[in-house]
Amino acid sequence: MLRIVSHLAEAQAELERICDRTHDDAVVHREASVREIVQAVQRRGDAALIEFTQEFDGFALQAENLRVSGAELDAAYQQIPKELLDAIRLAHHQIEAFHRQRVPKSWVQFGADGEVLGKRYTPVDRAGLYVPGGRAAYPSTVLMNAVPAKVAGVERVVITTPPGPDGSLNPAVLVAAQEAGIEEIYRVGGAQAIAALAYGTATIPKVDVISGPGNIYVTLAKKLVYGTVGIDSLAGPSEVLIIADRSANPRWVAADLLAQAEHDPLAAAILITPDLELATQVGFEVERQLQDHPRRLVTEKAIAHYGLAIVVDSLETAVKLSNQFAPEHLELEVEDPWALVEQVRHAGAIFLGSLTPEAIGDYVAGPNHTLPTSGAARYASALSVETFLKSSSLIEYTAASLQRVARAVDVLATAEGLESHAESVRLRQQSLDR
């Protein structure tokens, strides 16, 4: 089932096809539908949320139960096993420890004539986190979005997540939110939740930044509201690219490919190796492990359409292909991964060595698992504390420093036809010359 390609031109064409897998005519149609939803929420607020939640989630939402109650939050702790609570707490600790090390510090520097230049970082006032529902519950998504926002110092962080047909929310999601210090949670999902966060309703506050993954409707809604609010990214389906040599364990490689494919029918799982025998063995292992897979239909579809093994002449060629694809997750299951990593230019996250499956990064390693997809790793990075911060330049000039640059400002402003710019400096210089 895992197709093997050994011609370079064909491999490049396949990687391009996989990278563009969400760019189809259906997206254009969906964008029109999403625009209608967003505009309805902007106009009608809570009433539109109630209507769309009934239509899409099958739950008769009321304005008074949009927000999750304190009783529900308390009860969630009784609804999950202790082992899961312990795992959530371990993940929270690891993620927080990593992100605290990544907080940029404000700074100033002093020039020769006493001028002061610097940069000051401040958090946004409000952040809205989207946590998907649907096929699975994602407490890890809560932590990966909530922890950077809290570490950044955002004063008000709220969560939206879609309810089940009975209005319930997954207790693990509610527990993860509370462990991260968030108790303001709203039971609404989809494009309508993004619109509510962007424009505000009588119940849900307007925020400054929206983060969190979702389906195509959520992604399109984030695209539409960008500019009204900041967003983390426009995430596409998940993907892993594994570079492996003959030292790799084919069972482990197959398991890592399937771990990505089980996310979504559009997920991509790619192996690049200079070893044809390894590629063949991995293909056999993929089929064997699929037989009893609990998410076989989803996983099988992803492997059939976006699973691929590419056989190349060298590891150097493998890295070149990877850089062209710019994967969300890159695993280096090779004998000396640190020797190879220096050649990697574009990847959302890099997992070095056979004992570092991508799942470690999904849950407990600490670095963020919200990563650029669909080739965006060429220019974008993981969600971080900086997603919830903005910087302001600090500039203070003295008499001496103003005198030193005044003529240059005058000349440049005059050349651009901005006379008042030039005059604003001339007046000060004249005052200093008296």
Swiss-Prot record:
EC number: 1.1.1.23
Protein residues bound to NAD(+): 130, 192, 215
Cofactor binding notes: Binds 1 zinc ion per subunit.
Cofactor(s) in the UniProt record: Zn(2+)
GO molecular function, one term: zinc ion binding
Pathway noted in the entry: Amino-acid biosynthesis; L-histidine biosynthesis; L-histidine from 5-phospho-alpha-D-ribose 1-diphosphate: step 9/9
Keyword Calcium: no
Top-level taxon in the UniProt lineage: Bacteria
Keyword line: Amino-acid biosynthesis, Histidine biosynthesis, Metal-binding, NAD, Oxidoreductase, Zinc
A GO BP annotation: L-histidine biosynthetic process
Enzyme class: oxidoreductase
Binding site for Zn(2+): 260, 263, 362, 421
Gene Ontology annotations for the cellular component aspect, listed alphabetically: cytosol
InterPro entries linked: Ald_DH/histidinol_DH (IPR016161), Histidinol_DH_CS (IPR001692), Histidinol_DH_monofunct (IPR022695), Hstdl_DH (IPR012131)
Catalytic residues of the enzyme: 328-329
Positions contributing to substrate binding: 238, 260, 263, 329, 362, 416, 421
Reaction(s) catalysed (UniProt annotation): L-histidinol + 2 NAD(+) + H2O = L-histidine + 2 NADH + 3 H(+)
NCBIfam families in UniProt: hisD
HAMAP family listed in its UniProt record: HisD (MF_01024)
Record family assignment: Belongs to the histidinol dehydrogenase family.
Job description of the protein: Catalyzes the sequential NAD-dependent oxidations of L-histidinol to L-histidinaldehyde and then to L-histidine.
Protein name in UniProt: Histidinol dehydrogenase
